[in-house]
Amino acid sequence: MVLIDGVEASVAQIQQIAATDIDNVSVLKDAASAAIYGVRAANGVILITTKKGVADGKTRIEYDGKVAFDNISSTWDLLTGDEYRSLKESMMNSSIQLAQDKGNAMVDYGGNTDWMKEITRTAVSHQHYISLNTSSKYSRTAASLTYNNYQGIVLTSGKEEINGRISTEFKHFNDNLKVNLNLAYTSKNQIPVEKSALRQVLIWNPTMTPYQEDGSYTPGADPLIYRNPINLLNETRRDDKYNIFTGNAKITITPLKGMTLTGMLGLDRTM
């Protein structure tokens, strides 16, 4: 069981929290401490407390940014166009009989293309985080916005993510009344790697060029078997988009010393 600021959290809510927004994490493992949460806490309770601003009456703005570069560390050892031509010539000059050449796969088109290199890139990813913390005599507020853009090594793949969060705490009547409000919004767009394009890299003729003289994609000799890997990546791009909105409110009243009344309300919606 996971509680964020005293309210039970879903997996989506946990994923929405940026590490820089977390103030404290504690674990309740003994039965006595977890008993107040019922049977759902049988395996323990994880308590996550988010930042709500420092109660010093000041306003603070923080920014953190990162840039990362990724390259493919190893790749398949495929024939180059020249190696392909040499192999074909050796086979033609030997007693080896070629099987049926489906789609003219063994034809020499005069190019010398490294298809794995053509569909990969140096991926540039960047992350940005900005936060605002403010407080007054009766309240504390912390707001943050995170933007992550992860570019995939394979063309067209990657992930873009935006996280917004605001946490506010109000105290009145000598702290006998406390109200906590937490709102979070996440927008994600993930573009997975098109695996069929990787298969085409393995079987595509290395003597063919990616583009024709007019700039259009070079078609496969047999379109039912061979498809241009670059064209395939652009044509079959799939964007997996979704938005998550979560929020919770908690009110704590202390009418008498040693007596506390607590009410909680939560919302979790994925669109």
Describe each model-derived feature in a short phrase.
Residues 121-139, 146-148, 230-271:
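Outer-membrane beta-barrel transmembrane strands
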Residues 45-47, 127-129, 163-167, 184, ...:
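Membrane-embedded beta-strand positions in outer-membrane beta-barrel channels/transporters
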Residues 35, 41-65, 128-130:
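N-terminal periplasmic accessory domains that precede
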Residues 5-32:
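Short acidic/polar hinge/loop motifs at secondary-structure boundaries
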Residues 15-20, 37-42, 121, 157-160, ...:
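Short, glycine-/polar-rich solvent-exposed loops and beta-turns at beta-strand/coil boundaries
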Residues 55-111, 152-157, 163-246, 262-271:
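Surface-exposed loop/interface segments of Gram-negative outer-membrane beta-barrel transport/assembly proteins
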Residues 41, 54, 134-138, 147, ...:
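A generic beta-sheet turn/junction motif
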Residues 1-5, 24-28, 45-49, 62-64, ...:
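Soluble periplasmic/extracytoplasmic beta-strand elements of cell-envelope proteins
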